[in-house]
Amino acid sequence: MNPNQKIITIGSVSLGLVVLNILLHIVSITITVLVLPGNGNNGSCNETVIREYNETVRIEKIIQWHNTNVIEYIERPESDHFMNNTEPLCDAKGFAPFSKDNGIRIGSRGHVFVIREPFVSCSPTECRTFFLTQGSLLNDKHSNGTVKDRSPYRTLMSVEIGQSPNVYQARFEAVAWSATACHDGKKWMTIGVTGPDAKAVAVVHYGGIPTDVINSWAGDILRTQESSCTCIQGECYWVMTDGPANRQAQYRAFKAKQGKIIGQTEISFNGGHIEECSCYPNEGKVECVCRDNWTGTNRPVLVISSDLSYRVGYLCAGLPSDTPRGEDSQFTGSCTSPMGNQGYGVKGFGFRQGNDVWMGRTISRTSRSGFEILKVRNGWIQNSKEQIKRQVVVDNLNWSGYSGSFTLPVELTRRNCLVPCFWVEMIRGKPEEKTIWTSSSSIVMCGVDHEIADWSWHDGAILPFDIDKM
């Protein structure tokens, strides 16, 4: 065979193989398209797969076709009923750790927001940590000066409980330098206060959409709870203050349904001062333990009924729970009047347990350091000093801050009572430490049927950060 014949032969064989390959592909495609879908067993060619993710529940409809996945994101189905929340509080013998975010430790090298005023609130399916950001990250130049309470950069955001307030998992809720949030069983309601001191506005969001507003009525820093509002049978309640922080101000309780305000009442409290209430549902009413920033070192108590009638006074216990405060031995409690003659204060909480009361407070009498929770026999109704339980959460060598209450709904726990829980903010940076910023992390505790040993779940970040050394 001469060279020309060899070339022709090789070319013919190659062309034949190419034609055969094309025919095989045509047959394969024909069988796939026309035969397989009609055999009653689609396999993985066309199916819906439901996947649950830890951070939220997300339904994915995945259509698999010729090795190509088409993913369609479908909104999470809404609950079709409101939470009841008329059950009594569960009796708690102690408080066990629920979560700790370690946000400042992580933020030394991670993308974590500068925050203050964290709080927790729960839906029928999850608990979330809400917080007020400063529009800046830890260890960044924009964190300078974040000791300031009110600015146009502050926003309310949230993450699933236990997560750090990081940029990748945080969800925007509202523009706010003061806020509250709660879930009625169907959707989240958030309230964010923002704007100038003399004309601040509170914007109500329901399901992420603005639905109503409250304008400042006294023209002096309209503000709200900095902790969870309270929903009972579809109606949600919260408390707001407008007026001076160091003398008589004005106070109102509000009620909303599905994000629309359906009622409000003026709280008459001459000689008393109410700010930053920590509220929870108990036997169909809203019970709040608040902050007196004017004179009292005992805490105001506000009990709100469904018709917005109320009872207001002070926590009766013969032990003070605000900071700063005097010696326990020198304090005389009162159910009706501010006692202790100490200005300023810090957000705190208490839980009624029958006639007894669990009340949280800093361990230090003069600064926001350490944290303990005490159970006082008959402290809800009498000037009792009988301390029957004490649990340390943060030792007095470490900084604490605000604290507040929330409950675990029966939909989460499958119990016939509401589990009392609280969180403790641990403030780091200015004004106590040599940094250019102020931020915080938190520890969350929930009531259990056992006594829990003392320990210190403190913040633990090593300061200063790199940005503070520049």
Swiss-Prot record:
The protein in question is named: Neuraminidase
The region called Involved in apical transport and lipid raft association is annotated at: 11-32
**CC annotations in GO:** host cell plasma membrane; membrane; virion membrane
Membrane-related topology note: Single-pass type II membrane protein
Q: What class of enzyme is it?
A: hydrolase
Segments of this protein annotated with the region Hypervariable stalk region: 32-86
Miscellaneous field: The influenza A genome consist of 8 RNA segments. Genetic variation of hemagglutinin and/or neuraminidase genes results in the emergence of new influenza strains. The mechanism of variation can be the result of point mutations or the result of genetic reassortment between segments of two different strains.
UniProt lineage: Viruses, Riboviria, Orthornavirae, Negarnaviricota, Polyploviricotina
